Amino acid sequence: MSPIITHEDELELARTEKEVVSQLKRLAKAQNDLINSQKKYAENLAKANLVREMLNRSFRDVIKQMQTLLREKKSNVQDEEVNLYQDIIHNNDGYVEVNNKYIDAIKNLTLKKEYFVEKKNEFADALSDVADKRSAVIKKALSVEKMKNKLVEGEKLKKLDADFNDYQRDFDIARDVLIKKIHQFLEVRNELDDLWTILKDSVSKSS
């Protein structure tokens, strides 16, 4: 036998929805902090890449001078030194290219994550509105029921029903908005998942 559903059950649902709102807001804030950290990481990585490029320019200058000296048999420069430096330059060029792709992937991800957090907050706000209106419509229903039990006259009864219908209409509108916000939230989350895949694919060996 199914339990009897009471008005209190729906009021409890509204209270629980408010708890979900609170947790959504907390998660959004935590994700904002993480986004800021990822932005800072990308910024520091870009600075390191710039230094690496400057290092390569210096290495190329050294090699150019070494190659000039190699023409002199009595110079203290060996072919092995030049070859080793050339290998370092070649590897550094590869690291710069890989890191640039990685930095771009992080930037794209953080931009989408900012939009995702925005949609999460909109979802939370819409859910909060639904919880408020759910509670209001139930309390209004209880009030109307109480008045009906007092056998109020016809005109007052019509007014009570009209008032309740207004509350119900407000709730229905809020719920429609919530459903729309949930769909938007899920859509952006799927887009974010795709960007995580791109970020993962951009990771390669980099010293």
Predicted regions and their residues:
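Short, low-to-moderate order helix/coil transition modules at the start of elongated helical scaffolds
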Residues: 1-207
